[in-house]
């Protein structure tokens, strides 16, 4: 190595000021308080806050009107706005906590800040932190080092760099100091790039770009500029939430005005507050308050499950998008294969033994494996070391005295090793180059070439080895050096392959059963890619494989294997499938993969081999670099969507039924029972806002969690799975008739409760007690029926014909919700707050009405299922 002066400390400081420091700026994390405030941008939340504010106004007016006599009516009026506020804040807190956790898991550590490199400063070779490297520095690197910045080579000594993270090429690149002006920047062999790994030799280069201005940094900027993707379900929920909000706001105004007019203007101060409370109850009934919260909880539980299965989800929404994936564009090396070259076959010529062949390949080798299994060097040479038990090869008795390094022109590597008084010349390299240099194969060349063709036909890489013995060697004798690679004795060859993972074939088969199309995109050779793709079942026809250089963008959808692909071509492939309307997942581990990872619907980065920028660009990180893990994620995504849909159906059931009950109650039953209630000094109200909040939160809360953790019985990975429609296969029809039937039962038993109270001596003297009697029946029927409806959604068969143990968690969740209602209606202090009749045990008729309504609702569902079962519609 020549002596280089390098920069002075003053020059380094000046360079840093002019060109910047050598690190990639991290994207600033959104603080928790801002995440919390962002939850209040939702129109649903704004409407609930407005309802809370108006409830406060009503409470204040009522307080002024009663001279602040805090009877139980006024207490309830003051409790209601606080409960609405508590609901809003709880929802927002849960949402912000989940986003904050996802944000923390998404922040990848920048490995550059922890690395050191060797640099010439003031004529001395010193070690500095990579972040301190500046433009103009002269850097020395050798095998095992990571290139710290982009630069131009000044000196090389058999330097080979692995740049697959940037170019997609899995073979190390031979570096020179000669430039090629016609080549692209990434193809310039006299340039080195930040993040590349030196696998062989050594070199000296001068830094030309650092930090964000390197090739890595330019791609990193596209990652920082990317936006968070919404899942298909989140997009639908955003629209549904807006629809509910505007519909609720419109009905609020209409109901308030009509109710005020119906109540009359004689006692306007009192009547407008009654109308306002009714309108607020309607808004609370319409809006499914738990919509976002329950979906986030389900997503979070699924994310935790996948984390244990080696899939780290960065954003909650990704889990559901996974379930809708139709195309998986996957790398070959390390994802479908083991990312570890292995000797899978060998040929020993004449009397050569496996031990002889293995010993020669280990001696002509510059890789190393330490006692703690730390591997350094070219992956192919490492595979040769791992082929046989080296302890049996007696390698320590051989001493290397000379090496003629491998280069891409000769395609050979030669070493001279000494044992006792013998000098053994060992030559390793390409079989087609090595065979003509051997003098013992003249009559067997054709047979050997046939064997080599068979290996090539299987997509295997072959390496041949030969040797000769000298009894005198002088490395200063140029004539002897020139003759080293002639008159050799052929020993044989080995065939190497990065073999497929055992689980990859099963995962590909699972994809095809699920109508998911796997696409292989690789920087490797077409023949190698084709063999692996056929073995795994990705490729069925030879004309479905194409080289990147021969790719016609109009025919992208016709191919299943793409070989020798550039990053731009990979991006074009992903874009073509997306433009055709497919949901696309992409795997990658290098900087060059970042644009495609961002473009895809679900970007999957390899956790072991993936670089930080690829991890930043991805939506989930596969910590075991295994294709099967992605397939597991898709299955979990499908289950998550199914669970979310069941929760949404239940939420919409109570929203629709609650809205119908409040509307018809106000305008029909309100007129029917108006006289009875007003004569006893009480306004008409089927449900209070607090009752509706309890139904929308507690009724669905326990079953929602239970649905998330309950194993599904459906075969989710058989056939296509669409997340485009929330309701299909008569689910929309069922939702309508169930909601209307539940509304009818609620209004019916509310009316029966009112009639019972009117005719009961203990209750008929108080309008408040009369209203509470009816409200108690309706409250329990609507809530308990919705809780048990979670079980209806689990199976198409009647519940009486299924084993309860299959859905034990949902049973537990539903019964827990019913227990909440029982506590409310039977514990007097709770009943007072939630507007139900106290001392209910004294009124068994009302208890029978409450349970009777629930039994009728569940019974009707069982009858409908039996009818369908009889007609073969299930």
UniProtKB/Swiss-Prot annotation:
GO biological process: monoatomic ion transmembrane transport
SMART domains per the UniProt record, alphabetical: Cation_ATPase_N (SM00831)
Active site, renumbered: 331
Binding annotation for Mg(2+): 589, 593
Stored PROSITE patterns: ATPASE_E1_E2
Keywords, in A-Z order: ATP-binding, Cell membrane, Magnesium, Membrane, Metal-binding, Nucleotide-binding, Phosphoprotein, Translocase, Transmembrane, Transmembrane helix
Enzyme Commission code(s) on record: 7.2.2.-
Membrane topology reported for the UniProt record: Multi-pass membrane protein
Disulfide bonds: none
Catalytic activity line of the entry: ATP + H2O = ADP + phosphate + H(+)
Keyword Transmembrane helix among UniProt keywords: yes
Record-linked Gene3D superfamilies: Calcium-transporting ATPase, cytoplasmic domain N (3.40.1110.10), Calcium-transporting ATPase, cytoplasmic transduction domain A (2.70.150.10), Calcium-transporting ATPase, transmembrane domain (1.20.1110.10), HAD superfamily/HAD-like (3.40.50.1000)
Domain of life: Bacteria
Cellular localisation: Cell membrane
Any GO molecular function: metal ion binding
Transmembrane regions listed in the UniProt entry: 42-62, 80-100, 238-257, 276-293, 645-664, 688-708, 727-749, 771-790, 804-826, 845-865
The keyword Protein biosynthesis is annotated on this UniProt entry: no
Function: Could mediate calcium influx.
UniProt family annotation: Belongs to the cation transport ATPase (P-type) (TC 3.A.3) family. Type II subfamily.
PANTHER family reported for this sequence: CALCIUM-TRANSPORTING ATPASE (PTHR42861)
Protein name: Probable cation-transporting P-type ATPase
Protein encoded by which gene: pacL
């Amino acid at each position: 190595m020549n002596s280089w002066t390098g920069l002075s400390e003053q020059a380094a400081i000046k360079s840093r000021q002019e060109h910047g420091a050598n690190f990639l700026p991290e994207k600033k994390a959104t603080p928790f308080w801002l995440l919390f405030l962002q939850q209040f941008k939702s129109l649903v939340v704004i409407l609930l806050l407005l309802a809370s504010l108006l409830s406060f106004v009503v409470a204040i007016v009522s307080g002024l009107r009663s001279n602040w006599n805090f009877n139980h009516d006024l207490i309830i009026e003051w409790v209601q706005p606080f409960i609405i506020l508590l609901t809003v804040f709880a929802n927002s807190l849960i949402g912000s906590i989940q986003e904050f956790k996802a944000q923390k898991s998404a922040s990848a550590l920048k490995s550059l800040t922890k690395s050191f490199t060797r640099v010439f400063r003031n004529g001395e070779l010193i070690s500095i932190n990579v972040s301190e490297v500046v433009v103009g520095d002269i850097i020395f690197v050798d095998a095992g080092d990571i290139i710290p910045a982009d630069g131009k080579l000044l000196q090389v000594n058999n330097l080979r760099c692995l740049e697959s993270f940037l170019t997609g090429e899995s073979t190390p690149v031979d570096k020179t100091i000669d430039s090629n002006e016609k080549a692209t920047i990434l193809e310039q062999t006299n340039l080195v790039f930040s993040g590349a790994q030196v696998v062989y030799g050594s070199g000296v280069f001068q830094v030309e770009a650092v930090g964000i201005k390197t090739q890595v940094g330019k791609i990193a900027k596209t990652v920082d500029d990317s936006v968070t993707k919404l899942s298909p379900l989140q997009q639908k929920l955003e629209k549904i939430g807006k629809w509910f909000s505007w519909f609720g706001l419109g009905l609020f105004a209409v109901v308030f005005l009509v109710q005020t007019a119906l109540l009359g203007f004689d006692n306007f101060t009192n009547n407008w507050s009654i109308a306002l409370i009714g309108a607020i109850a309607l808004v609370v009934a319409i809006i499914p308050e738990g919509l976002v919260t329950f979906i986030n909880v389900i997503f979070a539980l699924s994310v935790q499950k996948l984390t244990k299965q080696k899939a780290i989800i960065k954003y909650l929404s990704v889990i559901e998008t996974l379930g809708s994936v139709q195309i998986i564009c996957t790398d070959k090396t390390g994802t479908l294969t083991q990312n570890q070259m292995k000797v899978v076959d060998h040929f020993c010529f004449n009397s050569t033994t496996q031990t002889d062949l293995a010993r020669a390949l280990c001696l002509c080798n510059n890789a190393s494996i330490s006692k703690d299994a730390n591997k350094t060097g070219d992956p192919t040479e490492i595979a040769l070391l791992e082929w046989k038990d080296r302890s049996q090869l007696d390698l320590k008795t051989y001493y290397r005295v000379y090496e003629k390094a491998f280069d891409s022109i000769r395609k050979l590597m030669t070493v001279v090793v000494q044992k006792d008084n013998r000098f053994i010349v060992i030559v390793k390299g390409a079989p087609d180059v090595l065979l003509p240099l051997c003098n013992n194969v003249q009559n067997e060349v054709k047979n050997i070439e046939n064997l080599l063709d068979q290996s090539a036909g299987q997509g295997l890489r072959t390496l041949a080895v030969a040797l000769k013995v000298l009894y005198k060697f002088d490395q200063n004798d140029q004539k002897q050096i020139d003759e080293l690679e002639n008159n050799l004795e052929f020993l044989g060859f080995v065939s190497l392959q990065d073999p497929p993972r055992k689980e990859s074939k099963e995962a590909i088969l699972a994809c095809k059963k699920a109508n998911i199309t796997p696409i292989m995109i690789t920087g490797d050779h077409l023949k190698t890619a084709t063999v692996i793709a056929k073995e795994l079942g990705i490729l069925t026809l030879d004309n479905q494989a194409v080289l990147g250089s021969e790719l016609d963008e109009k025919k992208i959808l016709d191919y299943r294997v793409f070989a020798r692909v550039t990053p731009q071509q990979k991006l074009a492939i992903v874009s073509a499938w997306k433009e055709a309307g497919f949901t696309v997942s992409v795997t990658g581990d290098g900087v060059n993969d970042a644009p495609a990872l961002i473009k895809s619907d679900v970007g999957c980065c390899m956790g072991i081999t993936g670089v930080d920028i690829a991890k930043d660009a991805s939506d989930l990180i596969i910590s075991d670099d295994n294709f099967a893990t992605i397939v597991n994620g898709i299955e979990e995504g499908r289950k998550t969507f199914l669970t979310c849909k069941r929760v949404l159906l239940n939420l919409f059931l109570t929203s629709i039924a609650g809205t119908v009950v409040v509307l018809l109650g106000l305008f029909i039953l309100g007129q029917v029972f108006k006289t009875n209630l007003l004569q006893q000094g009480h306004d008409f109200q089927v449900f209070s806002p607090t009752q509706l909040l309890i139904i929308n939160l507690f009724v669905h809360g326990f079953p929602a969690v239970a649905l998330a953790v309950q194993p599904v019985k459906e075969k989710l990975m058989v056939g296509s799975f669409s997340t485009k429609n929330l309701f299909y296969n008569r689910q929309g029809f069922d939702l309508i008739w169930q909601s209307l039937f539940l509304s009818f039962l609620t209004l019916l038993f509310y009316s029966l409760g009112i009639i019972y109270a009117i005719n009961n001596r203990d209750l008929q003297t108080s309008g408040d007690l009369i209203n509470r009697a009816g409200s108690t029946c309706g409250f329990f029927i609507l809530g308990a029926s919705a809780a048990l409806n979670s079980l209806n959604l689990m199976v198409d068969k009647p519940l009486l014909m299924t084993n309860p143990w299959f859905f034990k968690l949902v049973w537990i969740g539903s019964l827990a919700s019913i227990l909440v209602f029982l506590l409310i209606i039977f514990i007097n202090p709770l009943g007072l707050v939630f507007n139900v009749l106290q001392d209910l045990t004294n009124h068994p008729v009302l208890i029978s009405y409450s349970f009777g309504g629930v039994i009728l609702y569940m019974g009707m569902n069982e009858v409908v299922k039996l009818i369908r079962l009889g007609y073969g519609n299930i």
